[in-house]
Structures are given as C-alpha cells and as structure tokens.
Amino acid sequence: MRKGLLKPLRSFLILLLLSTEAYTQDIHFSQFFETPLLRNPALAGIFTGDIRVQAVYRNQWNSVTVPYQTGSFSAEYKKSVGSGNDFLTLGGEILYDKAGTVALQATHILPAITYHKSLSDEKNMYLSLGFMGGWVQRSIDRSKVTTNSQYDGTGFNPGLSTGETFPRNSYSYLDGTAGMSFSSQIGENTDNNIYLGVAYHHFNKATKVSFYGNPNYEMIPKWVGSLGVRMNISEYAFFTLLADYSKQGTFTETLAGALYSWKLDDIEEPKYILHAGAFLRWKDAVIPVTKLEFKPFAVALSYDANLSQLKPASNGHGGIEMSLSYQKYINKPNSSADAVRCPVF
C-alpha cells in the first residue's frame, strides 16, 4: 500500500509547488558558461568572433522521478558601430523546460541587445550594457495530476476527484532582464582577460504568475553576479576561472569552478583545444566537465554528482548536460575582427 501511494504523494508535492506564489527557482544550467545571455545579457558579444550559436540540453532526476528536461538555444551577432571602437551585439535566447509527472512546461522567447562602449584606444577594455526581454508561457497537463484525495481507504483510485480546481492550465507573461559588464585584457598578454558582470532579472515583476490567476502573485526579481578570468600557463596551456552568484528572494546559489585547457596543435591559432575541470554548486552538486573545441565548433559534457539532501534517494545521481556551440568571424566589411579585441573565453 505504501508503494502505491508514492506516486500520488509525489505528484501532490509537485502540485503544492505549482500553487505557491511562483517563488520557484529559475531555469539554470551547470554549464552556465554556455548560456551567457541567461546569466547576464551584458555578457553577449564577449567572445572571439562575430557570430556565436549555442545549444544546451539537460536531463535530471532520472533516478528519483519522471526526468526533468531543459533545453536552451541562443544566438549572437556582433558588429562595429560608429567611427570609434564601440560595437553592438544582437541576439536572443529560447528556453524550454518540462518537469515532473504533471508535465509542468515552460517556454521562453527572449530577444536581446547589448551595447559595448570602448574604454581604451587599444580596443581591449569595454563597458557593456545589455537588455533581454520577451514572452514566457507555463502550462501543466491536468489529466496527469494525482493527489491523496484519490486514496479510497484501500488504495489509489484514479476514478476519484483530485480535489483540486485550476482556473487555467496555462498562463503567460512578459519578462525582462537588464545587466552591465566590464571586460578587459590583463597585462601585456592579449590572451589574458577578465570580465565582471551584474544582472537584474525580472525587473518588471510580472503579476498573475500562477495557475490560479491571483494578481497578488508576482515574479521575484533576481540578482546575478558573474566573474570570468582566463590566464595563460604556458604556450600550450591555460586555465579559466568562472563563477556565478545568484539571489532571488531567500534563495541563493553559488556556482564556481575552473577549466584547464591544452592546445592540441598550433600554439598561435589552435584548431583543437581540450578542456577539463570541475565546478561546485554549493551544498548541491559537484560537476566534472570536459569540452573539446574543433573550431569553429565545440562540444561539452558534464554530470551533476548530487551532494544535497536528495542524495540518499537519488544514489548521488543528478543530471547529465550536453552542449554544442559554433562561433567564428564572418568575411564582411562590418566584421568586428579588426575593430575590437574580445576576451578569448
């Protein structure tokens, strides 16, 4: 009997989460460095090239419940503007998330624009301001909702009412993010770089963000601070430090780590680079990462080893994440190749 109740009780817990004041955690990825727009729209364009396209897929909690599946697709196009060393990045992010037995789904379509102001005649120091905003829709499959009201005294009875009434099974809203970043070369070596950024997510505080349509429910703004440092170790090797700190209401998250990288061929213009390292999501997971660049493409694979209170139930298993990226210069007069020196992250 206890086994028969696990599924409805689990679904009931998920349902409770859906009916709260939308204080749930935003979509996030362990390979956060492959989703720059999601971190901070002012990080758009901070790469070597004119165009960058990135796709990330995450599959989580297979060992505990119905898998949580999340996907991200983003694109950026960078071009010089004016007669100085400034440039502009146009881009966008599409997110899809499906979670749990009630098939809670979210779709985000978010165009972005970022302006990069040059602070140096050497074209190696920039202050960037970015905005991203668009449409978000969330939905559930009410036919898959089960609760303990469907327990008839002897077992689970799907013919009984769930006892829950939703005014709507989907809702949508507009969402906006603003951010700033500072990026610069470190010292005389053009390969050594740093960036710092801060972003304010959900600045418009969208209301009625619940399946009950309650106007008192609103999105809680989120602050995200970002850091990236890239330093040469030798002619053939370098390391990259990356970190994010997020705060949304009472929820905080710290994610940080490093990648060690080896150039596998020409040291000046390597086509093949192998990266390996690990990240820590504080009190939640250790995340080993491997990445291979074969320019203009790159693929990365990571895995979350669970450290949280779910570790006994999940046997330490978390989620697997895969990413594919493409970036290069384009042979056009408005290319940024000769106009800027971008951090080589």
Where are these regions (language model features)?
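Bacterial N-terminal signal peptides that target proteins for export
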Residues: R2-F12
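Sec/Tat signal peptide C-region and signal peptidase I cleavage site
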Residues: T20-T24
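Subset of outer-membrane beta-barrel
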Residues: Q25-F345
